[in-house]
């Protein structure tokens, strides 16, 4: 109800805005289901963090490769280069994964993951965000 008020009643937030909520409890399956339904029905993008996960920056961890959200031009170029016709041809990343929440990727957006490689120094991998 609080989220509906911010988006609809008071019109403080628009569909282009991200609402980040920090809670003291763990995020449960019911909350994730509600956030998925909210995105599917109204395109309201809400990220809920457990405060314990904010004690360190996951993006600075040495095991987490660099993630970059592609803009629309890069997305078009990526799809042309790799002949991607359908989004189902791209591996997905859940919008509720810690890295996806940290970079704020929305469902339908593509992120480029730059991983270290023994043979090529770095390798690029791409993932599409799923709701």
Language model features with spans:
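Extended boundary segments
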Residues: 34-78
């Amino acid at each position: 109800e609080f989220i509906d008020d911010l988006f609809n009643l008071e019109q403080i937030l628009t569909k282009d805005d991200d609402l980040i909520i920090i809670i003291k409890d763990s995020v449960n399956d019911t909350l994730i289901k509600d956030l998925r339904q909210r995105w599917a029905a109204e395109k309201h993008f809400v990220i809920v963090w457990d405060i314990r996960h904010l004690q360190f920056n996951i993006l600075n961890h040495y095991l987490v490769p660099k993630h970059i959200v592609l803009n629309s031009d890069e997305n078009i170029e990526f799809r042309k280069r790799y002949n991607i016709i359908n989004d189902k041809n791209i591996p997905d990343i859940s919008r509720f994964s810690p890295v996806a929440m940290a970079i704020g990727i929305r469902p339908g957006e593509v992120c480029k993951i730059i991983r270290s490689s023994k043979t090529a120094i770095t390798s690029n991998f791409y993932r599409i965000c799923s709701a």
